């Protein structure tokens, strides 16, 4: 719905051609890697390869990304021994203060756990490790809380935006030609034609592929909720010394490691890969014929 509204507003404020060109060029960019790989692999295997990478990144990557906190603590410790580096790092962090504030305020509205975290005692003692950074203890804990959610949320959002933009493109570009031919009634016929053709173009393989993507996102999101809830409930990363933070991060790493090594996760990944292979076969061998036959059938009805 958001994509359709954005597309409609774009058509109202500018001429249709640049908007359509932008969507088609964006779709072309999204397919560029697939087309390039298809020069060396069969199209079915190319589609399967990139869909598999997306699903594995969304589900497994959510458990890998939190390990970046190890680098953050090591970097803070290094500042104690390198004054010039600390000054440079603090100045660099100042550039991102506005962005971090916007993200923090927006995320709090979406996830109640963030409000609980901010309400906890995030005070800092003198000569604490946080004096070496421009960001506060609260900011660090918020970042640790949000990081596991990034991959599943971004993956599902991008897939939704791409699918919504394609749907909007089909709808409005189907309605306009029919309107030019037979007037206002043509809008209804054009939308109906576009919806049916879009479903024929997506559903044969999408009825398998889309749920797999959603399940991958759900796996990553479920891990993120467990990981982040631990930060809030156990008041982790609330210390002022590197040793205390390293102990908490080691505990969080054990949660992420358990998730990555879990039999349940890899069983689900295996099942998703099998379904993606079936979807890729349908997309390359069945969907084009279904879409073509559907378009011919609608053309005969309208003629």
Residue ranges and their predicted role:
Residues 1-4, 47, 51-52, 141-153, ...:
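Alpha-helical transmembrane segments and their helix-start/interface "positive-inside/aromatic belt" motifs
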Residues 59-123, 142-180, 210, 214:
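Transmembrane alpha-helix/helix-exit interface in multi-pass inner-membrane proteins
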Residues 109-154, 186-196, 201, 248-259:
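Intrinsically disordered, low-complexity acidic Ser/Thr-rich regulatory segments
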């Amino acid at each position: 719905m958001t994509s359709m509204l954005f597309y409609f507003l774009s058509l109202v404020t500018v001429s249709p051609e640049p908007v359509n060109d932008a969507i088609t060029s964006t779709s072309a960019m999204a397919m560029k890697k697939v087309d390039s790989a298809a020069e060396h692999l069969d199209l079915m295997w190319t589609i399967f390869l990139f869909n598999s990478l997306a699903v594995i990144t969304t589900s497994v990557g959510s458990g890998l990304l939190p390990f970046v906190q190890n680098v953050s603590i090591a970097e803070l410790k290094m500042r104690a021994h390198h004054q010039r580096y600390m000054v440079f790092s603090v100045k660099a962090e100042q550039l991102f203060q506005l962005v971090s504030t916007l993200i923090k305020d927006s995320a709090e509205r979406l996830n109640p756990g963030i409000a609980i975290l901010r309400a906890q005692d995030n005070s800092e003692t003198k000569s604490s490790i946080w004096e070496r950074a421009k960001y506060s203890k609260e900011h660090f804990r918020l970042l640790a809380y949000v990081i596991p959610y990034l991959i599943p949320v971004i993956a599902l959002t991008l897939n939704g935006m791409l699918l919504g933009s394609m749907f909007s493109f089909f709808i409005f570009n189907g309605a306009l030609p029919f309107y030019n031919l037979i007037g206002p009634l043509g809008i209804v016929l054009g939308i109906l034609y576009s919806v049916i053709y879009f479903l024929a173009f997506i559903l044969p393989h999408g009825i398998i592929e889309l749920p797999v993507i959603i399940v991958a996102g759900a796996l990553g999101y479920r891990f993120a909720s467990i990981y982040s809830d631990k930060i809030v409930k156990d008041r982790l990363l609330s210390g002022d010394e590197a040793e205390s933070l390293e102990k908490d991060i080691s505990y969080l790493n054990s949660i992420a490691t358990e998730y990555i090594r879990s039999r349940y996760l890899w069983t689900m990944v295996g099942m998703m890969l099998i379904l993606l292979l079936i979807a890729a076969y349908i997309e390359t061998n069945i969907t084009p014929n279904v879409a073509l036959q559907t378009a011919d059938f609608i053309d005969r009805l309208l003629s």
